[in-house]
Amino acid sequence: MSETFEKKLSANPKTIAGYFHKLMQDWDEREVVELRFLGETRKPKNYRFETSQILKATNCVVEMNNRGLNAYAVVHPVLRQTPVSAKDADIKRAFFAYVDADEKGAADRVRESKLFIPEMEVITGTKPFLRNHIYFRFDEPMNDMLRWSGLQKCLIKKFGTDAAIHNPSRLMRIAGSVAYPSASKLKRHYRAEVTKLLIGGNYVE
C-alpha cells in the first residue's frame, strides 16, 4: 500500500454488505468468512465472521480499509475450527469459479464472453485501464477442490487472466473497499479507487 493514497476516499458499506451476502448466501453454520487486511510495510491482520455477522464483517472492512489497508476475503467458506490463516487443504467446497482480469484488455474479454452467466462482477479499478473480478456460481457446490483448481486453470487459459488464481484459499479483493495501489503501481499510473459491485448489470451502492 502506498502512503500517498487519497484520504478522501472511503469504503462503501452497502457495496461491501452486498458482496458478503452473495458470497455467503448458501453457507452453513459451520462455515465462516476469513478476511485479511494487507499493506506495504504493514503487519497483516486476519478476522473471521459467521454467516449471521455480515454487519460486523462489513463494519470491520470499513474500519480497517479506511486505515489504509487493502481488504481481501477468502472466497470459499472456511470451517470454523480451522487455524488462522486458512490454507488450501482447509478449503472443502467451492460455490464459485472466478477470474481476476488485471491485465489490459482482459476485463473486456471476460465481459464479452458467453461461456457463463456472471453472478457478480467486482470492478477493482479503472485507471490506467479497466480491471475486474468476475464470479460464476455453480448450480451445486463443488467438493472436489482438485477439479475446481483444474477448472480455474481452464478459465485462465481461455481468458488470459491472472495465472495465479487457482488455489482454493485464494484471497480476492472485497467489493466496496478502497483499492490502494503499491508504490510501484502508482508509478505506472494506477490510482486509489473505491471498488464497485455489479449484480445483474446493476451497481450495488
Give the positions of each predicted feature.
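N-terminal accessory/precursor segments of enzymes
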Residues: 84-86, 118-125
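DNA replication initiation on ssDNA origins
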Residues: 1-96, 170, 178, 196-199
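Short, conserved phosphate-binding/catalytic loop or strand-edge motifs used
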Residues: 121-133, 172
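N-terminal cationic amphipathic segment used for targeting or macromolecule association
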Residues: 1, 15, 119-120, 190
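Structural alpha-beta junctions
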Residues: 26-29, 59-69, 112-120, 156-162
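Short loop/turn segments at strand-loop or loop-helix junctions that form parts
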Residues: 36-38, 100-102, 124-126, 176
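DNA replication initiation modules
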Residues: 76-114, 138-205
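Intrinsically disordered, low-complexity coil segments
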Residues: 42-43, 127-128, 186
